[in-house]
């Protein structure tokens, strides 16, 4: 997400929009957070009392590795829920009679697992912790290590809090869309809902014939079914974490965007489209017209072409986050996309800034993803910092350079509180994940990046970032990986590493006070640290 073109917009947008769905739609968040923690502990203790193995309410065990998903959804926005079938191709690194998986508020009707040799084994799905969305799948027998195909048939209600797969009504018409970040994929389909598990997805949607359906990738086929249904198949995605999966079904209207031709970084042209509620898509022309220049600026900076097979911008009539960087299907609050000649300047500037922020995520977050939420700053700090550079280059009249200064000042104010956390804060629970989307991650993280870019010089910093992206493309990387890439360019090795880690791994900032003092015809500068 992103801030706007003014100091007020920056503060307003950051604090009220990019805190993701958690605090925006749940005003009693603190009370719920406490209740969630207590219930989670109780559920864990109850389950653990009857089982020798502790419920993994943080990270799942490492001996189960998902390798790809086939997702089949039957979605009718006019109904109260949907059905689905999840097929997970996975590897068991050790013999076991069970695995742990994420699932929440799902009714799982049938489960089986098939070995690479074609031997099918029945299994049972048990909800171990409803609050944390952790489930246990027990096999009818112990399975040896090897490759398997796990199949789960399920159904679920559309979410009512704008999380996961949710339904909205707009001008009397029903729409279904998604918001998976941070951990809402688990309430949408059985999955390994952690960012370290990046796999390709094959998505198929069966929907009423009168509606349109979209996903992260281009549609490859459409099959007309009986009784007014159709099935849409989509190209396999690049390796993605579950939190970046996106779908949309309903009476959406398409608006074609400007052509984005091939470049030296990318051999294929990009299909750019706007998606909006019925009869609204024409208002997306302005946002679409700005997109090619943003994309070119990013490609030139990273020396890495836009990595996905299409680019759809969707204007959501009801969306808890400000925007979401789903590759190929970026979702925005509708007011950020639906503009006309009478739109306030604030909206126009904010539209550009948020678009730039989300497009920057296509590299930082989507191509290279943090393995765990303690490195969320790699996503959000970089997108915030990169958006400022793009805005300053393409729209200097938006005064992004001044906004950067006010953002840094705001970050330092927050960073002076006794309760302040460090940028890289240990994440041990779901509650920790949800509270990581804050000004320390966005504003302070971006300020630290800006400081070290100035220290290294723009070219050295840029080359370090390029090396980082290329080395870890379509995989996971940590702060240490980024620091290593920058340290190599610095020529200072461990000295640079210690300096950058000191700003990431402890709260606060070094404070230097200066004062001028005159004595007769002499002036003294007093410096105190």
Feature roles, as predicted:
Residues 60, 89, 151-262, 286, ...:
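Extended, low-hydrophobicity, Ser/Thr/Pro/Gly-biased non-transmembrane segments
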Residues 36-45:
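Bacterial N-terminal signal peptides
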Residues 108, 133, 234, 261-528:
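Hydrophobic alpha-helical and helix-loop surface patches within well-folded domains
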Residues 24-34:
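Bacterial N-terminal signal peptides that target proteins for export
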Residues 83-104:
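Ligand-binding face of N-terminal immunoglobulin V-set domains in extracellular IgSF glycoproteins
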Residues 47-83, 91, 118, 170-174, ...:
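N-terminal, polar/Ser/Thr-rich
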Residues 105-170, 227:
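A surface-exposed beta-strand-loop module
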Residues 71-74, 88, 125-126, 138-142, ...:
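Beta-strand-rich interaction surfaces with strong enrichment in secreted/lumenal proteins
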């Amino acid at each position: 997400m992103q801030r706007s073109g003014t100091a007020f917009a920056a503060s307003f947008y950051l604090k009220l929009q990019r805190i993701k769905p958690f605090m925006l739609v749940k005003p009693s968040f603190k009370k719920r957070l406490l209740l969630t923690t207590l219930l989670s502990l109780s559920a864990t203790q109850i389950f653990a009392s009857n089982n020798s193995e502790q419920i993994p309410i943080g990270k799942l065990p490492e001996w189960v590795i998902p390798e790809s998903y086939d997702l089949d959804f039957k979605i009718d926005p006019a109904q109260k829920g949907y059905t689905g079938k999840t097929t997970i191709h996975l590897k068991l690194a050790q013999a076991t009679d069970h695995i742990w998986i994420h699932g929440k508020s799902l009714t799982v009707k049938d489960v089986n697992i098939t070995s690479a040799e074609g031997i099918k084994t029945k299994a049972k799905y048990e909800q171990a912790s409803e609050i944390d969305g952790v489930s246990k799948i027990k096999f009818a027998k112990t399975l040896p290590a090897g490759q398997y195909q796990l199949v789960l048939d399920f159904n679920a209600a559309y979410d009512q809090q704008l999380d996961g797969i949710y339904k909205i009504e707009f001008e009397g018409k029903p729409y279904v869309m998604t918001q998976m970040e941070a951990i809402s994929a688990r309430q949408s389909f059985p999955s390994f809902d952690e960012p370290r598990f990046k796999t390709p997805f094959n998505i198929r949607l069966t929907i009423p014939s009168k509606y349109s359906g979209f996903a992260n990738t281009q549609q490859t086929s459409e099959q007309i079914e009986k009784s007014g249904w159709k099935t849409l198949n989509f190209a396999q995605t690049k390796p993605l974490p579950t939190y970046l999966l996106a779908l949309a079904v309903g009476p959406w209207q398409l608006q074609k965007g400007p052509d984005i031709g091939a470049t030296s970084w990318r051999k294929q042209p990009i299909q750019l489209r706007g998606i909006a509620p019925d009869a609204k898509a024409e208002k997306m022309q302005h946002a679409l017209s700005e997109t090619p220049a943003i994309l070119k600026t990013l490609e030139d900076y990273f020396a890495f072409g836009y990595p996905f097979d299409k680019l759809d911008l969707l204007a959501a009539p009801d969306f808890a986050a400000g925007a979401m960087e789903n590759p190929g299907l970026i979702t925005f609050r509708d007011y950020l996309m639906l503009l006309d000649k009478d739109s306030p300047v604030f909206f126009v500037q904010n539209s550009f800034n948020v678009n730039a922020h989300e497009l920057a995520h296509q590299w930082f977050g989507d191509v290279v993803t943090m393995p765990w939420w303690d490195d969320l700053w790699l996503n959000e700090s970089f997108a915030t910092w990169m958006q400022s550079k793009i805005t300053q280059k393409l729209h200097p009249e938006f005064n992004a350079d001044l906004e950067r200064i006010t953002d840094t000042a705001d970050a330092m104010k927050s960073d002076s509180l006794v309760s302040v956390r460090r940028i890289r804060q240990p994440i041990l629970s779901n509650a920790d994940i949800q509270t990581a989307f804050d000004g320390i991650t966005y504003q302070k993280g971006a300020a630290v990046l800006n400081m070290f870019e100035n220290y290294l010089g723009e070219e050295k910093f840029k080359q370090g970032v390029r090396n980082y992206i290329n080395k870890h493309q379509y995989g996971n990387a940590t702060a240490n990986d980024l620091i290593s890439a920058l340290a190599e360019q610095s020529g200072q090795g461990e000295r640079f590493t210690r300096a950058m880690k000191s700003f990431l791994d402890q709260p606060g900032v070094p404070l230097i006070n200066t004062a001028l003092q005159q004595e007769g015809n002499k002036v003294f500068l007093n410096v105190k640290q």
